[in-house]
């Protein structure tokens, strides 16, 4: 009986490890970190074979299958949490101010961000549009700064596929 619980726990933990590595490896691949992704795939496959063999060798126990399935789901969550922490890549943050007369671009520049700004027309009049490129790990901090300066600002971010040119392009990993 103790051996059965040990196998269920092992399947659960090993599958969490497998799917966590799988999720991070997939994100590394999408971000262009091919060598790191390839290296992580080696560990991913070793762990996968171990987990799958434990389930297939003990297929008569439904708890093993459930441990595998639940470990898979938990592994996805853990992998996504890890990816959020390491926050690879860059984002483009677009801001539409509530009022045009704000000195938001200079205040954001003073914080070390590159800002391009221009006049925009909204439903209720003139607005200022800003475009800011920053590392993903700085996204929450940037949002906080913008909201402190203009709590009514409309903010949306997206992930650029390629970056070329600009005053800090040499800092951006190609």
Curated annotation (Swiss-Prot):
Instruction: Tell me a GO cellular component.
Output: plasma membrane
Protein keywords: Cell membrane, Membrane, Transmembrane, Transmembrane helix
Q: Membrane spanning segments where?
A: 4-24, 36-56, 62-82
Bilayer topology reads: Multi-pass membrane protein
Stored InterPro entries: DUF2179, DUF5698, UPF0316
Task: Name the Pfam families for this protein.
Answer: DUF2179 (PF10035), DUF5698 (PF18955)
Q: What are the subcellular locations of this protein?
A: Cell membrane
Instruction: Give the primary localization class.
Output: membrane
Q: Which HAMAP family match?
A: UPF0316
Q: Which family does it belong to?
A: Belongs to the UPF0316 family.
Per its record, how is this protein called by name?
A: UPF0316 protein LMHCC_0787
């Amino acid at each position: 009986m103790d051996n059965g619980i040990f196998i269920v726990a092992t399947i659960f933990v090993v599958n969490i490890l497998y799917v966590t590595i799988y999720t991070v490896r997939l994100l590394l691949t999408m971000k262009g970190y091919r060598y790191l992704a390839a290296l992580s795939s080696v560990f991913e496959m070793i762990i996968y074979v171990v987990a799958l063999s434990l389930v297939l060798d003990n297929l008569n126990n439904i708890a093993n299958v459930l441990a595998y399935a639940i470990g898979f789901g938990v592994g996805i969550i853990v992998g996504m949490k890890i990816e959020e922490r390491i926050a690879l890549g860059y984002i483009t943050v677009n801001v539409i101010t509530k009022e045009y007369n704000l000195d938001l671009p200079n205040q954001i520049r003073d914080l070390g961000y590159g800002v391009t700004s221009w006049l925009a027309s909204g439903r209720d009049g003139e607005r200022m549009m800003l475009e800011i490129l920053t590392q993903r790990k700085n996204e929450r901090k940037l949002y906080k700064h913008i909201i402190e300066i203009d709590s009514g600002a409309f903010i949306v971010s997206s992930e650029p596929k390629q970056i070329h040119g600009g005053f800090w392009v040499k800092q951006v990993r190609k």
